[in-house]
From Swiss-Prot:
Its main location: secreted. This is Omega-theraphotoxin-Pm1a. GO terms for molecular function: calcium channel regulator activity; ion channel inhibitor activity; toxin activity. The presence of a 'disulfide through disulfide knot' structurally defines this protein as a knottin. Residues 22-45 form a propeptide. It comes from Pelinobius muticus (King baboon spider). It is found in: Secreted. Negative results: only exhibits a weak activity on Nav1.5/SCN5A and Nav1.7/SCN9A voltage-gated sodium channel (at 3 uM, reduces by 39% and 17% the peak amplitude and slows inactivation). In addition, this toxin shows a little inhibition on Cav2.2/CACNA1B (20% at 3 uM), but does not inhibit Cav2.1/CACNA1A and Cav2.3/CACNA1E. Negative results: exists as two stable, slowly interconverting isomers. Residues 1-21 form the signal peptide. The keyword Nucleotide-binding does not apply. Belongs to the neurotoxin 10 (Hwtx-1) family. 41 (Jztx-36) subfamily. Disulfide bonds join 52-66, 59-71, 65-78. One of its GO terms (cellular component) is extracellular region.
Length: 84
């Protein structure tokens, strides 16, 4: 009984990995295109904007904060702007 359970718990993940690897080998260009699109999207959003203030960092205006953050005027700190 223990041997059969062990075989099931080893065989199922192994089958999943082999199937996923076969699918990716069948369509390698899709994976490359997806990665290229992801890098372009990050560049457009300014994810790596230099000198930006992170969450709860002090700021003078919203342009000082990193993407998806805005300067809150009450105490002049960067907080989430509500965007997705």
């Amino acid at each position: 009984m223990k041997t059969s359970m062990l075989a099931v718990f080893v065989a199922l993940p192994l089958a999943f990995v082999l199937t996923a690897a076969t699918e990716e080998r069948a369509h390698p260009n899709e994976l490359v295109n997806s990665l290229v699109e992801l890098v372009k999207l990050d560049a457009e959003r300014g994810v790596d904007k230099e000198g930006c203030k992170y969450m709860f960092g002090s700021c003078g205006k919203s342009d000082d904060c990193c993407p998806k953050l805005a300067c809150k005027r009450t105490f002049n700190y960067c907080a989430w702007d509500g965007s997705v």
